[in-house]
Design a protein with these regions (language model features):
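Sec-dependent N-terminal signal peptides
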Residues: 3-15
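Exposed aromatic-hydrophobic patches
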Residues: 682-686, 714-717, 789-795
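Carbohydrate-recognition beta-sandwich/jelly-roll modules
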Residues: 24-26, 31-334
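Carbohydrate-binding surface patches
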Residues: 119, 581-584, 589, 646-692, ...
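Glycan-recognition surfaces
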Residues: 404-438, 442, 488-603
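Aromatic-lined carbohydrate-binding/catalytic grooves of carbohydrate-active enzymes
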Residues: 293, 297-449, 454-478
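C-terminal beta-strand-rich structural cap/linker in extracellular carbohydrate-active enzymes
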Residues: 711-734
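C-terminal outer-membrane/trafficking sorting elements
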Residues: 9, 738-820
Length: 820
């Protein structure tokens, strides 16, 4: 021990340790030992966790035929040192090992921080000759192929994180007896103890990273590799003609550096993934956004290519008249009207869109004929992307060929591999773009300036994973990898959106880099059905932590009655879908509320017939989006619900059932039942959601309005098949500064009659509701409601009726409705 202390003292003072001696770096629960035989062992809590760790690089010298590879297991180090350091994360000490093959040197660094519970690994390669440029597309910052048991737990699983949200992929979970490669970050966790291992890249400026993990017997690490330079079919780097993976681009310079990788063991794997995301955000801050969750409506849920301006206006008006006063608006009292694909220049003219933004949806007054009208004070959205479609190769790029700007076609801006266009999917129509080509900048500048003139404040950018592909070369010679090109292109979009005060939501997009958008779709396209909701929650089960990277996670448009589904969705199915929005972040409706939206073709339907089911959707929307308690949560909070137990799944890709979110005033718990046939019964331990029983004032279920009686250590739930329950636990001691403020200035009531059912929703609790015809005769009545919503059967003729609601506080509210 005295010898070891002397060696460590030498390391800290002189910087370099004798290569014949053991070098040991300790900090907190960590120990890193570089033995005298050059083996590297990582211990955690006194247990060997990773043995025979190594680094490896391949390289070539630009302008020469020289190339090589260096592996720390096969070359003796020229120096080993322990040095103090300070970076964006904090200060600490690092073990640095240098290896040289006579042409280039590899520096392997493992850093431990004074105040961080993890290790950071990086590898750097540089030429031994001054002035030479070195290039690498394969840098392993940390690896092992030696079996070692994880420090805790005997029933581990591992999480595979998808590269992007395209192709209907999912987060996947495997027994820890297989091998997988996760994208950018991987996690191994024990479902019983929650102990976890997390490894992931915290730099996303140059590299695509692959995290390869192989386990055995659910407790042994057999292989671990943290690779800068990973490409595959799933990163959309694939040549469909030759059936080969396209290699990663080269990082080059006086030296080439890998990404930095966080490596950590955590008592709770969920804390580990959150810590990983927070570390990324410390290094590269996310795009700032203080506007809260977007709440609104999108044309893509149902209207799609049949969209037209009268239908959009009627839908927006219905939302304003019937849902706004029930709290369906964002924290700034606005809703979004998002015009998706097939709007600009297809179903709607530029002039019509401009009229929407500058007049109909504005926050001021405008003239329509002799009338002065008040705008709806809504935010208008439009749809764009970073992609090239194969039918546009010869088409002129808008924004080029004007003034002194050169003319370009979309084919000019293609990113090519082996001289050919790079298609992201076999037989697919969309192709990779070179975001560094001037045509892209000119097009974005032209497009967003037009949108700004139309008062666009919300932009959905789709297929932007087309900008992160690898290729032969880029227009800008300083760009040499797909990630570098993506950052270049997204910065153009972000800077323009910032200039025009626009919210950016990414649709089909890589998860990393993240700093160029305020929101991102957490998964691929989904609409109304129960299985689609389970798919959305798969992304929250294993990817809720991405709310540290994006201000808003987006669950796609929330559809109640999908076109062509013949109103087959149950109310439980609708509640599940709406709750996926609550648990994720954004709250965007997808239904049509207008009979002016008609089919523009006869492809599977009658041309000219009304699209979908507007009247049925209105009735359901009042039930689902007229719930003031649900709306209040979405309006006043950002961030995603966290899984309570990630080990409750029954399949490799399935979502969890129970999620929670802690706010200053409440703890929210959502319990999903994705089974169509069997009720789900159980209980939630207060300990599992982080609240003391003595701090619970009331438990209310928000969909039924019922008050739940808790037990000493838990509360029970019973969720019908294909349904969901959301419990709100009010705290006795709430955070004063952040208590939710109800922005509704006065109670309000909205109602709709659809078929033989009347739905009444209010922003405050109702005691009873009566329905009157215009003669004053009561045709229906319901008492003892004690909830913000009432649904009752009616048998009435077409015509106008009056709803009269007796509120819980004794006041009365009325609304006029029409039975059609």
């Amino acid at each position: 021990m005295k010898i070891r202390n002397l060696i460590l003292t030498m390391a800290l003072t002189a910087g370099t340790v004798s290569l014949m001696a053991e070098t040991k770096l300790e900090q907190g629960r960590w120990s890193i030992v570089n033995a005298d035989d050059n083996t590297l062992t990582i211990s955690f809590d006194g247990k060997e966790a990773i043995k025979n760790a190594y680094a490896e690089v391949t390289y070539r010298i630009a302008g020469t035929e020289a190339s090589g590879s260096i592996n720390s297991m096969t070359v003796s180090p020229s120096s080993v040192s322990i040095v103090p350091f300070e970076d964006e994360i904090g200060s600490g000490r690092a073990l640095t090992r240098v290896y040289d093959d006579g042409r280039a040197s590899m520096t392997h660094t493992l850093s431990l921080y004074d105040k961080a519970p993890y290790m950071i690994a990086r590898v750097v390669v540089a030429s031994d000759n001054d002035g030479e440029v070195i290039e690498s597309n394969h840098m392993v910052a940390f690896a092992t192929e030696t079996r070692c048991q994880l420090p805790e737990g005997t029933s581990h699983r591992m999480i595979k994180v998808p590269f992007d949200n395209d192709g209907h992929g999912r987060y996947e979970v495997y027994d820890f007896s297989n091998e997988m490669t996760s994208h950018e970050v991987g996690c191994v966790f024990d479902a019983t103890t929650k102990f976890g291992f997390v490894a992931g890249s915290v730099d996303h400026d140059k590299w695509k990273s692959g995290i390869t993990i192989k386990g055995s017997y659910k407790r042994f690490i057999e292989k671990l590799e943290l690779l800068s330079g990973y490409t595959s079919q799933l990163t959309r780097d694939y040549d469909w003609e030759t059936k080969t993976v396209i290699p990663h681009g080269y990082v080059k310079g006086a030296k080439a550096e890998s990404a930095r990788y966080l490596i950590g063991f955590f008592d709770d794997w969920r804390v580990g993934l959150e810590t990983f995301a927070e570390t990324c955000a410390t290094i590269t801050p996310p795009a700032p956004w203080d506007g809260g969750n977007p709440m609104g409506w999108s044309t893509w849920g149902v209207m799609m290519n049949h969209v037209n301006t009268p239908a959009v206006k009627e839908t927006a008006q219905w939302i304003k008249d019937n849902l706004f006063d029930l709290g369906f608006h964002d924290k700034n009292d606005q809703t979004v009207i998002s015009l998706d694909s097939f709007c600009d220049g297809w179903g709607m003219t530029s002039s019509e869109i401009s009229q929407l933004g500058n007049r109909f949806l504005s926050d001021g007054t405008y003239k329509e004929g002799l009338q002065t009208k008040q705008g709806l004070n809504m935010r208008l959205g439009l749809y764009g992307g970073m992609v090239i479609w194969d039918w546009t190769f010869n088409g002129s790029v808008p924004g080029t060929g004007i003034r002194d700007i050169p003319s370009y076609t979309w084919g000019d801006a293609l990113l090519r591999y082996n001289g050919k266009e790079h298609r992201l999917f076999e037989g697919g129509q969309y192709c990779a773009i070179d975001p560094t080509h001037p045509a892209f900048y000119y097009n974005m500048d032209y497009t967003l300036s037009r949108w700004a003139a139309w008062k666009i404040k919300y932009i959905k950018m789709d297929f932007i994973n087309s900008g992160i592909c690898e290729g032969d070369s880029w227009y800008n010679p300083e760009i040499t990898t797909g990630v570098m090109a993506y950052n270049y292109g997204m910065k153009i979009i972000y800077d323009l959106a910032k200039k025009y005060d626009m919210y950016i939501v990414e649709s089909m997009a890589p998860l990393f880099p993240y700093q160029w958008a305020h929101g991102r779709r957490s998964c691929c396209d989904r609409f109304s059905e129960l299985g689609e909701s389970e798919y959305v929650m798969n992304a929250m089960t294993w990817g809720w932590w991405t709310d540290r990277l994006y201000a808003v996670n987006d669950p796609d448009q929330l559809v109640l009655h999908k076109d062509g589904h013949n109103k087959g969705e149950t109310e439980g199915e609708n509640r599940v879908r709406v709750t996926t929005g609550m648990c994720t972040g954004a709250f965007i409706i997808g239904d049509s509320f207008s009979d002016k939206c008609v089919y523009v073709d006869d492809n599977g339907h009658a041309k000219g017939a009304v699209v979908a089911y507007p009247e049925a959707s209105k009735a359901r929307a009042l039930k689902m989006f007229g719930n003031a308690d649900i709306n209040a949560y979405v309006r006043e909070n950002t961030g995603s619900f966290r899984p309570v137990d990630g080990g409750s799944y029954t399949g490799s890709q399935q979502a969890a059932y129970v999620y929670m979110r802690d706010t200053p005033q409440y703890v929210y718990v959502a319990v999903f039942n994705f089974s169509k046939y069997i009720a789900r019964n159980g209980s939630v331990l207060y300990e599992s959601i982080g609240i003391e029983p003595s701090n619970i004032k009331e438990i209310k279920e928000l969909w039924t309005g019922e008050t739940v009686s808790g037990k000493a250590e838990s509360f029970d739930y019973s969720v019908p098949a294909g349904d969901v329950r959301v419990f709100r636990l009010a705290k006795v001691v709430a955070g004063v500064d952040d208590i939710v403020v109800d922005r509704t200035s006065r109670p309000s009531v909205s109602a709709v009659i659809a078929g033989n059912e009347c739905v009444v929703s209010s922003s405050a609790e109702m005691a009873s509701v009566a329905l009157y015809d215009l003669s004053g005769r009561c045709v229906a009545r319901v008492d003892d409601i004690n909830h913000v919503q009432a649904v009752f059967d009616v048998n009435v003729q077409k015509g106008v009726y009056i709803v009269n609601a007796l509120m819980a506080d004794g006041s009365r509210l009325s609304a006029k409705i029409t039975a059609r």
